[in-house]
């Protein structure tokens, strides 16, 4: 070993160490050349969109503390992948170029979408990207309930049909993690060849919301809500049947009819809308329509604390509205495209239970009506159909991941699911979030 002025030449040590980590070391190839930890199991998290990345966060976090596992990220081709790379960077990840990811081999591939996955090498674990598998596949997709061709076939449940799970006659995932036994039954109807690889693990969002509800007042205080203030959460999914298409009818009513004192209103828009039209466009449309009286959340916001804190939910057929059935907040449906909804889903049951927002009656009287006629047991029955493994997602999901990796699990139970307290939307120092310009 070379000495420099009687000391170890650390540069030479680094050169020798780098020489032992040449191109091709391990499965992952050249990306590991300069790694400090070598011999790790290589995990690729495939982020198709901001929503998919948010959904996967609770899953890959189960691996984050294990020095035997190296988690990497890539952004897949997708119509809504604008913002996906920024999401990866926001959690401290580095984006592996898609072309490089397709050349390498991984010990585990994690994804909540389906596009492009046939290009990747490694056992694939697929997950849903929302709750309840509410939506049907697009009309005219040519995929029938049995996976046959033609344009007149029965529409499959979005995410559960062969168009999402089968490529070139082969079931792609090594495992398909589902939230509820009902979804497994849907796979049996729509894509029976994938039934053997399904596994019911529960729903991570469900567990985190459920764990946060007893501390609801802490979340309300963190957001800046004062005692007695009512929070109306307006949430929209994406697409032509969403609440967003009626924004010019809904938001002016919130701005004009709700008293400024005693109410706060927040708008949560599915990140796919911002990905398609730009965050600036969404913010501009919403703030102009609401005349500054509604706080607009950006696509990277964690919506779960808002849902926990909400006193009322005005929504549509999106996942957030369905999760609202857990909270005890009365729900009004402003839009619901019944023809595009899986009739066996909990979302369809919600549409038959929750009152519909009417343009012909005062908004405050409709909120009062929703509160008076709210029956907690009815909505609890809907919420129970989101997850058939309540409180057990982290344990069951971790067991599945380590089984695919071929590793023993860490010798401790996963940390209990915790929903972080949010930064204030409505600071109590005299500033106001009602202009729609704060934290967007």
Where are these regions (language model features)?
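C-terminal amphipathic helix plus adjacent low-complexity
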Residues: 2-5, 361-440
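A nucleotide-sugar donor-handling region in carbohydrate enzymes
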Residues: 2-5, 132, 137-140, 148-151, ...
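N-terminal pre-catalytic "stem/leader" segment of glycosyltransferase-like enzymes
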Residues: 1-97, 416-417, 428-440
